[in-house]
Amino acid sequence: MNYMRIIFKKFKARMIVGCILAVIALLAVSVIVFINQASFGRTPRGERLERVMKSPNYRNGEFKNQHETLLMTSDRGRFSGIWEFIFRKIDGLRPEQAVKAIKTDLRKIGRNEEILVWFGHSSYLIQTGGKRILVDPVFCMASPVSFVNKPFKGTELYTPDDMPDIDYLVISHDHWDHLDYNTVKKLKDRIGAVICPLGVGEHFEYWGFDKERLIELDWNEDCLLYTSPSPRDLSTS
């Protein structure tokens, strides 16, 4: 009887270990599948990677700020800071009522009008000199998962379908709340050119944008936007 108990305990222990390993393996596979979605884009390669590595701002495998920047200003460690940022409750963080906003039919605005429409955060539409410039549009998701970074009620007025044809799409950087995969995919065929930081063009090429439509700029580089009556300079800093 004791012998059978020992065998059963060993079998039970192996079953528990096996179940734990199976759960870990399943989680690992799930994470790998999740981060390999098209929406995560692709890291630079080929000629683009060579240009990135030749940048004076790229050192030790990453871009470096030109000036020293403090990431943590408190005495707390990084983990405790992240924990507090995620789980700390702040009163009044979200409006109790829907934000009042007026939706404009952007497609009916003539190209000769000078306008600026702010959609929230860093997303806005500029129309100047007969050209339309769309900056950091986020009309679908501002994070990899739908339950994080949800828009305030009343601010989700616009969709990609509401946008007019765009001459220049400007992306400041590739954080989720500035580069929305679903938005740019839906606008792809109505965008003339994409202006983005060095290396970020890899995402767009991976998503089906022609390489000829991509203008990638390093810090302190600039390009001319052909607007009427005269060209305008767009510089990075």
Predicted features by range, described:
Residues H175-L179, G201-H203, E221-C223:
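Active-site environment of divalent metal-dependent phosphoester hydrolases
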